A protein has these predicted regions:
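Hydrophobic anchor at the beta1->P-loop junction of P-loop NTPases
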Residues: 7
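The conserved Walker
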Residues: 11
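Conserved lysine of the Walker
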Residues: 15
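Hydrophobic positions on the alpha1 helix immediately C-terminal to the Walker A/P-loop
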Residues: 18
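Short beta-strand-centered segment that lines the nucleotide-binding/catalytic pocket of NTP-utilizing
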Residues: 26-44
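ATP-dependent small-molecule kinase phosphotransfer cores
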Residues: 39-96, 210, 214, 224
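A glycine- and Lys/Arg-enriched "phosphate-lid" helix/loop adjacent to the NTP-binding pocket
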Residues: 109-157
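NTP-dependent small-molecule kinase module
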Residues: 147-201
Length: 262
């Protein structure tokens, strides 16, 4: 727990991009809770959690139906928090971990090592409208955002309000400033080889997530030809490139942006 920085907040607020860029700048290990979705669901099923069993049994076309409370319960928001903590504790002791996700458990993380990114109501409204989500999904997002904000307030976790006025680099700078004391001890300690290994690890986490989805008995098709965005593995601290690649190609790796192979 003392070897991690924790970034929480609702979906779509920019956590993943901020954490990715912070990790790449400083040569840190990235942990994204989304990449453990199917591992966590399997743990919940093994533990006999009724909401997990109910979701798994529903036809995929019906999983978006139901009340916001029912959908939130089946998202396993509460149950996944301790799983996230267990995951991070199991990671190697070095380097420092940047852990991000909507399931970050505000009540279980050290507040001096945490920062929650919370959108303003106006920004959330604009983003939900832009996505064109059906009403049940939109209601779930609104409830999840309110739940995460309430959890942060109760745990007294520091909050960065996101209103859309700052670009991503400016937001990363603010998060970097918040964690400056911890980052100062890490910057410059990772070799190029270590940076590349950490980027490979993060990309393979995405590969595992997608393969985990297509391994479900109700999923059709194969993950190998699915395209996703992967981090360039050049290891340059200034590199922010992300490469569209199929899962199969990214798994074979390494993934490089044009001209970044050296």
């Amino acid at each position: 727990m003392q070897r991690a920085l924790w970034i929480g907040g609702p979906p779509g607020v920019g956590k993943s991009t901020v954490a990715d860029r912070l990790a790449r700048r400083h040569g840190l290990r990235l942990y994204s809770a989304d990449t453990r979705t199917w591992i966590h669901r399997d743990r919940a099923l093994a533990a006999g959690i009724e909401a997990a069993e109910r979701w798994e049994a529903l036809p995929p076309t019906e999983r978006g139906n139901g009340s916001p409370d029912e959908l939130l319960a089946m998202s396993l928001h509460v149950e996944r928090g301790p799983m996230v903590v267990d995951d991070v504790r199991a990671l190697p002791p070095t380097p420092l971990v940047v852990a991000e996700g909507s399931t970050m458990p505000a009540s279980l993380v050290p507040v001096d090592r945490a920062l929650w990114l919370l959108p303003t109501q106006e920004l959330q409204r604009r983003r939900l409208e832009k996505r064109g989500l059906p009403l049940p999904a939109r209601a779930l997002y609104e409830l999840l955002s309110a739940t995460i904000a309430a959890e942060a307030a109760e745990a007294r976790v520091p909050v960065l309000s996101v209103d859309g006025s700052l670009g991503i680099e400016e937001t990363v700078d603010q998060v970097e400033h918040h964690f400056a004391w911890f980052l100062a001890a890490e910057s410059g300690t990772a070799t190029l080889k270590e940076r590349r290994e950490l980027l490979r690890e993060a990309n393979l986490d995405i590969v595992a997530q997608l393969r985990g989805f297509f391994a479900r008995p109700w999923a059709d098709g194969s993950a190998e030809q699915v395209e996703r965005s992967f981090a360039c593995e050049c290891g340059d601290p200034a590199c922010t490139a992300r490469i569209e690649s199929t899962v199969g190609v990214a798994a074979a790796g390494p993934v490089f942006g044009p001209g970044h192979e050296r």
